[in-house]
Amino acid sequence: MRGDEYIAKILKDEGVSWLSCFPSNPMIEALSKEGIRPIAFRHERGAVMAADGYARVSDRKHIGVVAMQSQAGAENSAGGLAQANADNIPILVLPGGNPLNMLFVRPNYFAVNSWTNVSRHAEFITGPAETGNVMRRAFHR
């Protein structure tokens, strides 16, 4: 099973029914195949704010999930992520990523490094074998 398929299955098992997204992330297709409805936005911050709003109106009983492209897409989401974190709103942000051989090559944007200060938790998934543990920490921290 590929990493995106594994993440999609975990999200389905956690009760996620929809995904706010900005196009160009392989997670969108994988989640759609699991029956999780993607709702596309025109800007990454808007997608994050929709996930934030969903978690707020559910009184934090549901987690908002967002997917976007890597690099500038992940960077554009930081403001919305910081706001959700400041208000203790549970959202899960799934940016696209660089190939492992390009992971720390400049000028690539490193979402984990940047998001450490504006989120409760930020972590790389570098292979399918660690996906379950990383997702467990994301949902149950």
Predicted regions and their residues:
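N-terminal alpha/beta PP-like core and its mobile active-site loop of ThDP/TPP-dependent enzymes
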Residues: 1-141
